[in-house]
């Protein structure tokens, strides 16, 4: 009888830990989403910044890195890794969708913003 109670308690304890981990993961996802949106908003606000704005200049340099040759190299490596995984039969479609979506967002975000916004001013920040 004592062994049965210990096993039952251990299962309850494991279930409680799993629920806490799920709650922790959800809170991290929400935090990551909020921070990502905040960074994107700050970056796009800095696109039309003046020359004397040091924060805007730093964000423009960051955008140039993320849209320049470094980003193109990382995208090529990501596609090569997906190709190798496909040839080995180990491709997970979730990973492939995340990589392809990230590449599309990275390189097409300014076009999407220009399409949605009615502002015709072209920014001097970023790589075209």
UniProtKB/Swiss-Prot annotation:
The chain crosses the membrane at residues 30-50, 65-85, 93-113. Coiled coil: none annotated. It comes from the Bacteria. It is a multi-pass membrane protein. The keyword Transmembrane helix applies. One of its GO terms (cellular component) is plasma membrane. Keywords: Cell membrane, Membrane, Transmembrane, Transmembrane helix. Its main location: membrane. It is found in: Cell membrane. This is Uncharacterized protein RP192.
